[in-house]
Design a protein with these regions (language model features):
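Residue-level detector of Asp-centered blade-edge/turn motifs that repeat once per structural unit
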Residues: 21-24, 84-89, 137-140, 181-183
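Surface loop/turn motifs at the tips and blade-to-blade linkers of beta-strand repeat domains
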Residues: 7-12, 52-54, 70-73, 123-128, ...
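Beta-rich catalytic cores
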Residues: 14, 34, 77, 100, ...
Length: 183
């Protein structure tokens, strides 16, 4: 029930991060509890729908992620989210994933009509010993992620054809959120 002017959203379990879907009433949420799910939340009526994993998920592997072994639905545990805005209601979603594998999972978001749908397109497995927290889309087709560690964490960058590289000078205590600018 609402508390004054503040409505509650029921459904997503342990939402860790949220991203709005451009030009739509939808917000995507990462629910990290137990196996974990990705949810679509309708900002108009505050209802939510599980998008991934489901029994009928779709995949269309992208050659840029050829080192990824394919989709793994169990032990998903999504954490940080970033959305690369596309055109005509199609976007790219980057998801920090824990559980069965530590990786950035990549999905195509189709928000052209009705509830958005996700198509898994690939993943970039984390370097050995790295546990990601936050992810951000970079200009071009790359992305960056924080390795949350104490006393010293760092920033990692992934680019097609090159894979992961540690960003020099990015070491700090417990890096968490991350956002990039268009330039």
């Amino acid at each position: 029930l609402p508390d004054g002017d503040v409505p509650f959203i029921c459904g997503p379990v342990s939402p860790e991060d949220l991203v709005p879907v451009p030009d739509s009433p939808w917000v995507l949420a990462a629910g990290m509890e137990d196996d974990g799910y990705l949810y679509a939340i309708d900002a108009r009526d505050h209802q939510s729908t599980v998008l991934f994993p489901t029994a009928t998920y779709h995949s269309k592997p992208d050659a840029a992620f050829s080192s990824c072994g394919g989709p793994v639905t169990g032990g998903f545990q999504p954490h940080g989210l970033s959305l690369r805005s596309g055109s005509n209601g199609r976007h790219t979603l980057y998801v920090v994933r824990h559980g069965a594998r530590e990786a950035i999972e990549v999905f195509e978001v189709d928000a052209r009509s009705g509830t958005p749908s996700l198509t898994w397109t690939g993943c970039a497995a984390a370097p050995e010993g790295v546990r990601f927290n936050s992810v951000t889309a970079l200009p071009g087709q790359g992305f960056a992620a924080t390795h949350f560690a104490t006393p010293v964490g760092r920033l990692w960058e992934w680019q097609p054809g090159a894979g992961w590289s540690e960003v020099p000078g990015s070491e700090w205590n417990g890096p968490n959120g991350l956002v990039s600018s268009p330039d």
